[in-house]
């Protein structure tokens, strides 16, 4: 079973060339929002899929400008297809907003997928060279535990002492790992707005995707 994925904007032609270039396709998963022109393009893609005998699933993207939301939805579909035994031939990232394309590229890098872009004028497919990296494997088990604790308790700003006490770890151990994570630019030590003498740990929203805590 061979599947292809694609982001879809206002033009069906940004996706259709991949149907022709990929042999043995039996399933297509399309990511698009509810803009009337996007739905028109989706109707055309459905028509072509019907003619070619290809099953098509549409995944709605509520906010086409929310990179993390789109990436999480895309990765969920990738995992589902893999569990079902599909070979994912390629991810066409040509359609939709720039944020949707960026989300698709991010997922391709994290999941080890091939990706293509389709030229706006010639409709020629352009394979995209990507380094495929499992970012979570760059972290030690201890670092993952610390980041998970920080993310789970992110509502309240925490110092390194707070983290050590909350996790029942030695402060020196936590300080060492925090320093390493800050060096990797995974978290940041910033001034506490309520007490400028204190440094609190801040993490970005992308950490949720990196640690697969969705």
Ranges and model annotations:
Residues 91:
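Conformationally flexible catalytic loops at phosphate/diphosphate-handling active centers
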């Amino acid at each position: 079973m061979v599947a292809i994925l694609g982001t879809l904007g206002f033009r069906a032609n940004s996706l259709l060339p991949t149907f022709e270039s990929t042999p043995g396709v039996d399933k297509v998963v399309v990511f698009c929002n509810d803009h009337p022109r996007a739905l028109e393009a989706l109707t055309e893609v459905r028509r072509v899929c019907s003619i070619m005998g290809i099953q098509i699933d549409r995944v709605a993207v509520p906010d086409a400008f929310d990179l993390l939301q789109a990436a999480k939805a895309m990765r969920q579909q990738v995992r589902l297809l893999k569990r079902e035994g599909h070979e994912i031939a390629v991810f066409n990232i040509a359609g939709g907003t720039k944020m949707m394309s960026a989300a698709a590229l991010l997922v391709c890098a994290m999941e080890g997928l091939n990706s293509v872009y389709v030229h706006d004028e010639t409709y020629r497919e352009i394979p995209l060279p990507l380094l495929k990296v499992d970012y979570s494997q760059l972290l030690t088990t201890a670092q993952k535990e610390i980041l998970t604790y920080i993310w789970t308790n992110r509502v309240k700003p925490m110092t390194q002492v707070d983290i050590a006490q909350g996790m029942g770890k030695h402060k020196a151990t936590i300080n060492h790992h925090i320093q390493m994570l800050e060096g990797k630019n995974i978290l940041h030590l910033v001034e506490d707005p309520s007490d400028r003498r204190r440094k609190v740990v801040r993490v970005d929203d992308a950490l949720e995707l990196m640690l697969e805590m969705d």
